[in-house]
Amino acid sequence: DRLSESWLSLYRSGSCPSLVLAHSARGLMDKFNQSIWSTESSGSEELDDKQPLSQGCAAWFADSNKKALLAEVGVGTLDQAMMAVMPFKHNNLRLLGLSDKILLADEIHAYDAYMSRILESLIEHQARSGNSTILLSATLSQQQRDRLVAAFARGAGSRAEAPLLRYDDYPWLTQVIGQEVVSQHVATRKEV
């Protein structure tokens, strides 16, 4: 629901980007179901001249998690993106779907060692492809941060390293920009 309030603001006014929810509960989201075209709405499998073709594309993207990343905006579990760098059937389709996209992942501190390594591979691929990655965590350790920064730097062809942080630097923001890693303290609100 939070995304439904804000995702269109990322696009030009009047545009109609495709949105796909790539998780199992997508059928429970009324706004999402209303945003995609289905043959039940017209009662026919024939194209209706009154329905924009973009709705047909959105429905095609939404009918399979394998195609979900091809939509302009996709929301789902990170494993859908991770399968792009794993030896799965149709991983090349997922890689294509990630091209020219910003990967946004939350709660990245929660992954075990195995999943963290796959995430590092995904981040490295994103950087190698010239794509941006935004990783969010409230409790990411220095070691985890260093490995993720190193993965992005490798993909970008950089040898940049994350500077050490002191305990009182938390919370922090880290950016890999070209050959440089910038880390800075982030001010917090007094009340939440």
Model-predicted regions and their roles:
Residues 1-192:
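N-terminal helicase ATP-binding lobe
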